[in-house]
């Protein structure tokens, strides 16, 4: 894991930067699947916007990034939305978001860590080494590609299990 410095409106951020591999997820965020007749983000985005997080301009799906051997834990997300009723197929869910950056082929893309809380998302097991990111469109990216992910250390704790 490396540290990179970025300037924000208030103070420099020392981003934690890790290498990861883009892998296939459940394939429900971006479009219809066996479990959902629609893309989940299509339903969720308007709710997130109404609650203060506008994802306009971001790709309508998630990048699933395998961070092994690292794991992550959200400790102070920028947004947490509780009891989001976006489907009648299961009970409301909680979601948290924290800013991040994805670097692919030396180009940096703004993004958000997208974290459906596992305690409210019982249908899908989420590996603690798998980071889901909603980013601006990244031309040419595909499964198996290596990326770097930068996360805010005050908001996301990254560790390497012993």
Name what the model sees in each region.
Residues 5-90:
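Anionic-ligand-binding alpha/beta catalytic cores of soluble enzymes and soluble regulatory domains
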Residues 25, 116-117, 152:
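Fold-independent oxyanion-binding glycine-rich loops
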Residues 81-138:
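Glycine-rich active-site loops that engage anionic ligands at enzyme catalytic sites
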Residues 135, 151-153:
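Conserved "cap/hinge" positions at secondary-structure junctions
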Residues 140-142:
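Residue-level "contact hotspot" at macromolecular interaction interfaces
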Residues 144-149:
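Loop/turn positions that initiate beta-strands
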Residues 154-162:
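Short, Lys/Arg- and Gly-enriched loop/turn segments at beta-strand edges
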